[in-house]
């Protein structure tokens, strides 16, 4: 998973510098808020909302030009509002997920690693990540 900036296709944003002069909605105190605060230019108008629903509603209703949120929240918003023509702009922070197995379960651990490696090599992980998260899986550990 990752936290990123999302916005309309017709708004050119490739990185933090492009946030200048734009209004970005973010959930107060969330990871996205902390990461956005580190990189947003002084001229960016960061509007903080109390929860994800309020943040997304502000973007959908046009109160903000851009949305800083997690991939799953943005994916849901884009699926429910295709008329917005929203898209992924750039990553604020990667938040990888991990699979844990009980200590000493080497057979299981090796099998899980084998399945992941096969999915990575075949491109299946990238295909699923693009479908569900809007971008490739990225550089996964071996």
Regions picked out by a protein language model, each given a short descriptive name:
Residues 1, 8-9, 29-30, 51-52, ...:
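Beta->alpha turn/N-cap motifs
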Residues 11, 47-61, 93-95:
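Short helix-initiation/N-cap motifs at beta->coil->alpha
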Residues 23-25, 67, 100:
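Short, well-ordered beta-strand segments
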Residues 31-48, 86-88, 117-142:
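Ligand-binding clefts/hinges and TM-proximal coupling segments of bilobed small-molecule sensing domains
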């Amino acid at each position: 998973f990752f936290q990123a900036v999302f916005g309309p296709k017709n708004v050119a944003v490739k990185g933090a510098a492009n946030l200048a002069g734009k209004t970005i909605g973010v959930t107060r105190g969330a990871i996205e808020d902390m990461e956005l605060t580190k990189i947003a230019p002084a001229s960016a108008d960061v509007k903080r909302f109390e929860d994800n629903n309020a943040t997304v509603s502000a973007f959908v209703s046009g109160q903000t030009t851009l949305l800083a949120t997690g991939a799953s929240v943005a994916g849901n918003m884009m699926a429910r509002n295709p008329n917005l023509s929203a898209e992924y702009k750039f990553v604020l922070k990667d938040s990888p997920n991990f699979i844990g197995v009980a200590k000493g379960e080497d057979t299981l651990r090796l099998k899980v690693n084998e399945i992941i490696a096969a999915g990575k090599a075949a491109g299946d992980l990238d295909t699923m990540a693009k479908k569900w998260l809007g971008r490739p899986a990225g550089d996964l550990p071996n």
